[in-house]
Amino acid sequence: MFGQTASGSAALSPSGARVFRYEVVGLRQNEETDRMEFPIRRSGSTFITVPYNRMNEEMQRITRMGGKIVSITPVVAS
């Protein structure tokens, strides 16, 4: 996920090319994460890279998984 870029028609719009990195703490194993093939780690921060057009959905998913977003920073293309 690190260094993720948007492609297709979303990349043509000004918002489609914007990507943000969430710093999340407190993710825990629950019904939502039990459907995954791997366990959630129990300590420290997790970084999730999200395109602008999926920010709301990702915030909801993080909340359902028991996480708390402690920071959101834009990813600057270099």
From Swiss-Prot:
UniProt keyword annotation of Thylakoid present: yes
Domain of life according to the entry: Bacteria
Keywords, sorted A to Z: Antenna complex, Membrane, Photosynthesis, Phycobilisome, Thylakoid
GO CC annotations on file: phycobilisome; plasma membrane-derived thylakoid membrane
Similarity annotation: Belongs to the phycobilisome linker protein family.
PROSITE patterns reported in the protein's UniProt record: CPCD_LIKE (PS51441)
Pfam families: CpcD (PF01383)
GO terms of biological process kind: photosynthesis
Originating organism: Thermosynechococcus vestitus (strain NIES-2133 / IAM M-273 / BP-1)
Subcellular location: Cellular thylakoid membrane
Domain CpcD-like: 17-75
Designated name of the protein: Phycobilisome 8.9 kDa linker polypeptide, phycocyanin-associated, rod
Physiological role: Rod linker protein, associated with phycocyanin. Linker polypeptides determine the state of aggregation and the location of the disk-shaped phycobiliprotein units within the phycobilisome and modulate their spectroscopic properties in order to mediate a directed and optimal energy transfer.
S-S bridge residues: none
Topological type in the membrane: Peripheral membrane protein
